[in-house]
Curated annotation (Swiss-Prot):
Organism in which the protein naturally occurs: Hoplocephalus stephensii (Stephens's banded snake)
SMART domains xref list: KU
Localization annotation: Secreted
Protein name: Stephenin-3
Transmembrane feature ranges: none
Family matches, as PANTHER family: BPTI_KUNITZ INHIBITOR DOMAIN-CONTAINING PROTEIN, KUNITZ-TYPE PROTEASE INHIBITOR-RELATED
Amino acid sequence: MSSGGLLLLLGLLTLWEVLTPVSSKDRPEFCELPADPGPCNALSQAYYNAVQHKCLKFRYGGCKANPNTFKTIEECKRTCAGK
């Protein structure tokens, strides 16, 4: 590959890195888990919806949830949705 081709490739890779959203790189893996209401009492909680790329409310049972369960939408956004 010529030096011009290498420079073009380097430029394209740099542009791709700049345009990739930071939030998707720093998001914990558990943010990809589905909402898990658990078997106990129903409480209003939040989870990160990986398909819609946003935090949503759901009815949480109060026990045995996965880590993608937050007390507030704001806490979910800080952890999974980025800024």
